[in-house]
Amino acid sequence: MRCLRPTLLLGAIISACAAPPSIVTSRPVIGILAQPSDPDLGGPETSYIVASYVKSIEQSGARAAPIMWNSSDAELSAAFSQVNGLLLTGGHISRHSGYSNSTFKLLRMAQAANDAGDFFPVWGTCQGHEQLAQFGSGQQEPSILKPTAGTEGLIVPLNFTEHASSSRLLSAASAEVMSTLSKHKVTINLHSLGALAADMTRSGSAEAAFYRVLATNTDSGGSEFVSLMEGRAYPFYTSQFHGEKNAFEWNQGWELNNTAQGAEAHTAEAVAAMQYLSSFFVSEARKSPHVWLAE
């Protein structure tokens, strides 16, 4: 393998001659950052994780471990050291919240770990995708996200970019999976903000240097937003759409409001395509050497 000169990118030294990581565990644990409960529901403040995220991870052969959003720095570090990957879920949390602060602390840990040769993958869905997009800008403020129109309940096929077929995430996907994702209404969007493709691919920008855009979609106002991307130098993966919902959530507003559109999201092909993405992430987590201390 040709060995290139190490390159300075966003403060990280990246060596192109590093050997690809291999599988080191058959018992991966995915840390999921729990969110604060909705104060409008009343009662004491608690934390929660939507069950479909846990089910999706378990379906792909991993275990899920909650990481509390209000953990101390020491507790976040201890949790990070024991899990093999991090899942950032969807939600509607302010970027000025304690949850968002914990998110960025964990992402900095993941970046530092990978820089040090400690392989650690991250997946972000919807809000998690948006947080990872922001992280790629190199700063927590100001927000790089823009409003999207008509994307609450939008179920559409993906528009793949020229990078999709050669990406780490999709290069091993079957022709059937790629066809399902690109030709059928299977990706479930539930968002009012997004990372616009123009911003994430602008030449010379920190975002374009950090991420490779794999797929986009267009909102009702004609704005093209990023739907799927992966880190160029880090095992970070993001989807604006909710892949966990196809197999595990039923009779939700996004399908009841448009039953014809929602029906295709539950086909066997749709479920298989989303499980491919989840299983890929878990396969990445199997390369992490972190050890769950309860075993």
Regions found by a protein language model. Name each.
Residues 2-227, 233, 243-295:
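N-terminal beta1-alpha1 cap of cysteine-dependent amidohydrolase-like domains
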